Amino acid sequence: MSLSAAEADLAGKSWAPVFANKDANGDAFLVALFEKFPDSANFFADFKGKSVADIKASPKLRDVSSRIFTRLNEFVNNAADAGKMSAMLSQFAKEHVGFGVGSAQFENVRSMFPGFVASVAAPPAGADAAWTKLFGLIIDALKAAGK
C-alpha cells in the first residue's frame, strides 16, 4: 500500500509547485472539481446545495481547500512508506465513509488531478502515473471500507 521510491519522488516533484501556493491552488482545484462534477459539492456540509459562484464567494472555501491540500501533502510526503500509508489510508477511509464519500468520488478526483497539477507547472515524465497510483490506493482503501 505505497508507491515505490521513484514514484513517490515523481509525485513529490510535481506536487511541490502546487503546494508552494496551496491556498490559491487549493481553491482553484476545489472549484474545478465542483465545475466538472457539480454533485461533489454536496459531500461538503459547507457547500451542500450551493452554486459554484456561491462556493467561490464563500469564506469557507479556503478552510476546506486548505484541509484537503494539507492532507494530500501528508500522503505525498509518506507515499513510499508502506507502514505509514497503510495507517493513513485506513484512517482516511474510515473518516470519508462516515461522510458518505466513497470510491466513486475519488475516481472523479483521480480523473482530473494530474491535469490540474500540469496546469500549475509541467510535471516530470511519469508523474501522471504516480498520481494515478496514489489515488488508486485511496480508492482501494475506500472500497475496503465499504464505499
Swiss-Prot record:
InterPro entries: Erythrocruorin, Globin, Globin-like_sf, Globin/Proto, Globin_lamprey/hagfish, Mb-like_M. This is Globin. It comes from the Eukaryota. Belongs to the globin family. Gene3D superfamilies: Globins. Keywords: Acetylation, Heme, Iron, Metal-binding, Muscle protein, Oxygen transport, Transport. Residues 2-147 form the Globin domain. PANTHER family: CYTOGLOBIN (PTHR46783), CYTOGLOBIN-1-RELATED (PTHR46783:SF1). The modification N-acetylserine is found at residue 2. It comes from Aplysia limacina (Sea hare). The keyword Zinc does not apply. GO terms for molecular function: heme binding; iron ion binding; oxidoreductase activity; oxygen binding; oxygen carrier activity. Transmembrane segments: none annotated.
